[in-house]
């Protein structure tokens, strides 16, 4: 019985620590890079990714936090 209560207490403490760490995580603001953390843009923003080319050769993917429902077109 004591082992069961101790296990439950440990699980509760671990889950509280995880929730607190997630709440303290700073969001990524508008027009900042989100390549490594695509789900971490601030509220009202989305992470949009583009494949970068140099002289026709793919050089990787770049992602940026941009406003939702906004579409950018090349000029």
UniProtKB/Swiss-Prot annotation:
Residues 1-21 form the signal peptide. Contains 4 disulfide bonds. Residues 22-25 form a propeptide. GO terms for cellular component: extracellular region. Its main location: secreted. Keywords: Disulfide bond, Secreted, Signal, Toxin. InterPro entries: Spider_toxin_CSTX_knottin. The keyword GTP-binding does not apply. It holds the Pfam family Toxin_35. Belongs to the neurotoxin 19 (CSTX) family. 06 (U6-Lctx) subfamily. This is U6-lycotoxin-Ls1e. It comes from Lycosa singoriensis. The lineage of its organism: Eukaryota, Metazoa, Ecdysozoa, Arthropoda, Chelicerata.
